[in-house]
């Protein structure tokens, strides 16, 4: 029985919104990013890159959890965006998500902003 525990397969655990802000694509994942839901973020990120957006702003303010699979999705998008002359900017990480980036050292390879306005102004 699925009790909605971390790591369990449950539809609707991650919702992703995408919108354009100037020359940036703003991608907002809401919920849990893990091995069950990673493709729900990977596909919109790749779609943005295919549409010519090399500057991706990922608004993490509604992201409740991120495991190593989710981190790899973001790292892959970063490499693709940088090879196209852009990058991936992370915004508003919750402490539990920021800790994953801190522990793995991934916070050193992403540009991290406190607010969406700050990310879009850069």
Where do the language-model regions lie?
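N-terminal non-cleavable signal-anchor helices
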Residues: 7, 27-28, 50, 101
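Short acidic low-complexity segments
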Residues: 113-115
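N-terminal acidic, proline/glycine-rich, low-complexity intrinsically disordered segments
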Residues: 1-9
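Residue-level marker of intrinsically disordered, low-complexity segments enriched
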Residues: 4, 14-16, 24-25, 55, ...
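A charged, well-structured terminal subsegment
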Residues: 117-122
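STAS-typified acidic loop motif
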Residues: 9-43
């Amino acid at each position: 029985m699925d009790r909605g525990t971390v790591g369990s397969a449950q539809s609707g655990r991650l919702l992703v919104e995408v919108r354009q802000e100037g020359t940036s694509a703003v991608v907002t994942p809401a919920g849990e990013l893990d091995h069950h839901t990673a493709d729900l973020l990977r596909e919109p990120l790749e779609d943005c890159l295919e549409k010519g957006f090399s500057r991706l702003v990922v608004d993490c303010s509604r992201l409740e959890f991120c495991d190593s699979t989710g981190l790899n999705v973001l790292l892959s998008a970063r490499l693709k965006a940088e090879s196209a002359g852009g990058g991936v900017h992370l915004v508003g990480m919750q402490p539990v998500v920021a800790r994953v980036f801190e522990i793995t050292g991934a916070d050193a390879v992403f540009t991290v902003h406190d607010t969406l306005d700050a990310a879009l102004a850069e």
